[in-house]
Every structure is written in structure tokens, then in C-alpha cells.
Amino acid sequence: SLLLQSAIGLCKQNNLSSLHTTFCSRQEFELGQELGMLGRVSQQFHWLNEGYGTFDDFLSALSSRKRKNIKKEREKANNFGGEIEVLSGTQIKKEHWSFFWEFYQDTGARKWGTPYLTRQFFDEIHETMRSKILLILAKKEEKYIAGALNFIGSKTLFGRYWGCVEDYPFLHFEICYYRAIEFAINNGLKKVEAGAQGEHKLARGYVPTETFSLHWIGEERFSRAVQDYLISEKNAVRRDIEILTDFTPFKKGDRNHD
């Protein structure tokens, strides 16, 4: 509360137009609104660890049809003619980043036009936080062809970037979703956040989950207009979550999705 109050005060003192806090906790979200900040409710797909001991334990919580679909996808993905490496800490070498940089540039160029991270960024995280990085790479004929970068939190695995130079059926799902789930289970993590968007994640065990952000806008009339929009958006997001929850792959009645 004190930190948010101070930040708002600095904005006012320096005549700044706005202040934004993204991906805050529910508690921070409520505190910020008490201080007059605008609250925004959004939605992502997260995988939640319900105390699973193995990936098969997770599969056993799914309906029979969804369980079979995932097994088929994994089988096809792992038959691409190469191998998948799951690397963290000192297992990650400097040369791995040269390959991942190529993947990152390819994805960025296709989706957003200009990748915003620099090559130096990957060298920097290698030196400063390698112990908090999970790099999952697909290798074929001694060449890395695809990969995903994840960051390891105290309770959560954060999936952030994916890219490839060769495309194979279901390899994206295997590297970004299923291997991430396996890592979370094996390392006692409570959640996997696989990034924004993607209703395709639903069938793979990632459930619709509310996310929160806070916004202070200095111009009062603009702030009121934004607030009106955020109220209607929040209602729409919560309706979407309610609808999507009915289509999760879990056995009916086995899980609380709140």
C-alpha cells in the first residue's frame, strides 16, 4: 500500500500522465483500487498442479477422450526424428543461446514485425540468472531446430518465448506445454503460466484464470472513460471464463476451477 501511494505521489509531483502495475496479485489489486487506481481483469490459461506425482497422475484427472488425445499428440511430437533436451542451470551453455536467438528472431518477425529483445539480453540472463532458466530444445541431426524459454519462479514456471526453424506436428505443444508440465511436477511447482492468449491450451490442461493489473491516469475525464470500459470488459472476461471452464478436459466434478 505504501509503495503504491508513493508511486502515485511521484506521478503527481512530476506531472506524469499515468502509472501501470501489471500482473499484480489479487491482494495488490484490491489495495490499489482502495487507493483510487483503476483495476483491470484479464484472462490467461494456466496449468495448476493439484499435487500430481507424475505426468500420468495429471492425465488420470482428464476425461478418457482428452487423455487419449494428449497421448497421441505426445507420441507424434516425439517421433519427429530427433531428441528433446530439457536444460536448466549449468546445463545451459553459451552456444545454446545462438540457436535460441535464431528461433526468437523467426517468431518475432512473423508475429510482431520486430523482435524487441537484443542478442545481448540472452547473454546477460545467461550470466546473471541461469539457475532460474529452463530451456527446452529440440535437436535433429546435431542441429537445434526449435525451443522454448521459461523462467523458474518460487512456485510458478513462466513460459515466455518459443521459436523454430523447422516445423513438425505437435512439437510446439510438446515443448511449450507438456514438457513444462513435467518439469513443474518433478520440481514441485504449483503452476505453469504459458503466456497470453491461446484457447488451444484449454484441451491440454491449461485452465482459464483471471489476471490483474492496476492503472492510475492523471487526467480525470480520461480516467473516468477508461474506468467505464474496464467495468464492461471485466464482466465480459468473467463470462468468457465461465463458458470456457465448461470445456476443460478434466473429469466432471473432479476439480474446482476458481
Locate predicted features.
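Conserved GNAT acetyl-CoA-binding A-motif
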Residues: 14-22, 184-196
